[in-house]
């Protein structure tokens, strides 16, 4: 009878554990990252009684979580890809809205300005038309300033997004390292996997992949080694490695991502960081925001510089040679923070606006010579032992005859130009519409030339062998941003669908199905009742034997 009682007890114990496991699944059906658990049973070692082997009941081998590593990796990859495209799309949509707005964009005010120039040229002696020209010019300047301000605000928003994302990455990786330690200790001490802790760790990995592309390599001791981007270690066993944010070496207003020694982490290139919100935001800044702000600045410089050049060829109402109508800021030159002598600076000036590009440039001194590189296509534009040098309509120089090895400078010809644009005067008499100092007030020779600038091939556009008009250059910029926005709209939706499908596939295997759990609950309940009945019968039989013995 003791054998029957023992078998019944093992069955009762298994049923109890099964009910507890199912109950745990039901309780966590809505818990993020929870993977359902199942009880694993095995028959107890049978005993040989001579006439054959008699079973000894059941053993509970363990509680196993249903987790598919392949599906999990698919979800992690899809999450990083989806968040990257979504972050890029949400940011570029703002730029697209800014540029394409028919009332807030640049094209209407440029058109209005040249219409006023034409009107003034048609009636050069009329003060009212001259005043209208001044007002239209001021409106155009204000619009350039406003667009640049909004782009600067987007740039500040990107800085905030980068900082927030890096903070989240460091928090998740620190928690993963802590769980690695706890899980490893639990496995070593009991030999069993702490399923709920492992779920928590996998959920943290999933959250980490929302911020950056994440790769996980499982170790023999149950710990995870986690790598980000193109292979930067974030977690190795119980050791966590942080990302940092720091100002760019050549632009203190630009937040960059750095890695390495906490005292002096090295700035990472955009190519090193991919996927997730952080990757998407950095890609948007480097591919779209920088390019658009530079192009807007290029348009402002080119229009203003060429208008000034023609204005100074004419004569005003007082028969005085015209002066610059627009105030145009000089290109910005920034010394690297790593330069040996910070007093050694670079400078740049525009010599031919029609040759100006929307790219930034670097000037580096190595092995006895300077190298000037155009950054948008990585082209080496000039090399020599001494400066100045003229590159793409711009003269570049340094203020030293004794450069140090490794000295580096960043030249930004156009990024800040739209924000610096202003009117140099507002006196209507100073508009130089006349072509000669001796002709009468009806002389409009120079006014007609100023108006003709609207349709001239004045702006250099990347990828084109011929220059474009101001309107064409702006339209091409708007079109490029619009095309990229539409592309990302489609891509982000496709990536979101891929993530949804990957998540559904994993949930169908690892998620809690309440209908299935209810069925299992009834099954274990019946097993529990049957085991109890078995023990009751065994007990009754034992009582009969005792009575027979008396």
Predicted regions and their residues:
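S/T-rich, low-complexity, solvent-exposed segments of bacterial secretion/appendage proteins
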Residues: 1-550
